[in-house]
């Protein structure tokens, strides 16, 4: 599963060029989570999860507070959570998660992104069955043995444990996300290199250079769409 960590790491490296876009996406996600439940993360697991993710992207406190205050203030702006599935060059698979206040606009933009970059939209379920929803939590400063021990003490049986680039990564069930984080926090860990719930492909495919260039453009175009929150795929980009 190490390659999946590489994909997230590449996204984090790229964010330096797109901080305003990343922050805007988090602002929307935090607002939606706070609006759908209590604006207190200790009483709202969805909000708590988004805030933990936001920390790993260094989202400024002011943006977080503004989004929560907007939700508290009774804003009537509503967003729909949507998932689109589709295919890129050579049958590569793509999942697009969006938060939108205009479903028709988002569907049109996502469809155009696929169509102009060697892909096409699929029906619901055409791609997702080839991915596993997985909690991914990574820390520095602990060995695999350290992490295995703390997980055992917390009575947590996770999917996988990988050490890579001085980062120890835990792959767990989605509903274990907070329990794994809490197990780390009990040992004094306060910062996480990665804290995500991601869609991990069961198998990856490699593309020709030409197809990969087109595929990377497709992903870039999708990620640049204002309403798109996450893009998952099954291509080994070889990075």
Curated annotation (Swiss-Prot):
Cellular component annotations (GO), alphabetically ordered: cytosol
Cell compartments where the protein resides: Cytoplasm
One GO term of the biological process aspect: regulation of DNA-templated transcription
Keyword DNA-binding applies: yes
Name of one Pfam family that matches: TACO1_YebC_N
Coiled coil region boundaries: none
UniProt keywords, alphabetically: Cytoplasm, DNA-binding, Transcription, Transcription regulation
Keyword Transcription among record annotations: yes
GO MF annotations, alphabetized: DNA binding
Family in the record: Belongs to the TACO1 family. YeeN subfamily.
HAMAP family xref list: Transcrip_reg_TACO1, Transcrip_reg_TACO1_YeeN
Name of the molecule in the record: Probable transcriptional regulatory protein BH3259
UniProt lineage: Bacteria, Bacillati, Bacillota, Bacilli, Bacillales
């Amino acid at each position: 599963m190490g390659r999946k960590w590489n994909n997230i790491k590449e996204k984090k490296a790229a964010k330096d060029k797109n901080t305003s876009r990343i922050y805007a996406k988090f602002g929307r996600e935090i607002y939606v989570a706070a609006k759908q439940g209590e604006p207190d993360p200790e009483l709202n697991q969805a909000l708590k999860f988004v805030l933990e993710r936001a920390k790993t992207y260094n989202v400024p406190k002011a943006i977080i507070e503004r989004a929560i205050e907007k939700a508290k203030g009774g804003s009537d702006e509503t967003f729909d959570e949507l998932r689109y599935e589709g295919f890129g060059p050579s049958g590569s698979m793509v999942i697009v998660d969006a938060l939108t206040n205009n479903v028709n606009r988002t569907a049109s933009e996502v469809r155009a992104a696929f169509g102009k970059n060697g892909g096409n939209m699929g029906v619901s379920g055409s791609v997702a069955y080839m991915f596993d929803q997985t909690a991914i939590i990574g820390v520095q400063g602990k060995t695999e043995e350290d992490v295995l021990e703390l997980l055992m003490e917390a009575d947590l049986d996770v999917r996988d444990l990988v050490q890579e680039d001085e980062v120890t990564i835990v792959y767990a069930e989605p509903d274990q996300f907070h329990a794994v984080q809490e197990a780390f926090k009990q040992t004094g860990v306060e910062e996480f290199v990665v804290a995500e719930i991601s869609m991990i492909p069961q198998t990856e495919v490699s593309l020709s250079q030409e197809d990969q260039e087109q595929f990377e453009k497709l992903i870039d175009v999708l990620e640049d769409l204002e309403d798109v929150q996450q893009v998952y795929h099954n291509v080994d980009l070889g990075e």
